[in-house]
Amino acid sequence: MDYRKRLKNVREDHDLSQAEIGHLLNKSQQGYNHIENGRAELKIDDLITLCKFYNLSADYLIGLTDSQKELDESSSHHKQ
């Protein structure tokens, strides 16, 4: 699935507006709309913010997998 469609589907599944997600990413509603509609690219910092906000993996959000794996906090820290 195209990541733009996935972003829109996840946002709508959470009953959130483009303006609300735009605010989360420090963008206007129009700025976020441009990401969902292909007029702007999703920046890696914004992807990380969305993954944490939705508690979903980047692989799922960008459409590399259809498995809605939640983020595993322990895997993001290196064991010493």
Predicted features along the sequence, with ranges:
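DNA major-groove recognition helix of helix-turn-helix/homeodomain DNA-binding modules
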Residues: N26, D45-Y60
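A short, Lys/Arg-rich alpha-helix, primarily the initiator
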Residues: M1-D13
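Residues that mark the N-terminal boundary/hinge immediately upstream of a DNA-recognition element
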Residues: R6, S17, K43-D46, S57
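Short, charged recognition helix plus adjacent turn
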Residues: I62-Q80
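Alpha-helical residues within the helix-turn-helix
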Residues: E12, H23, K52
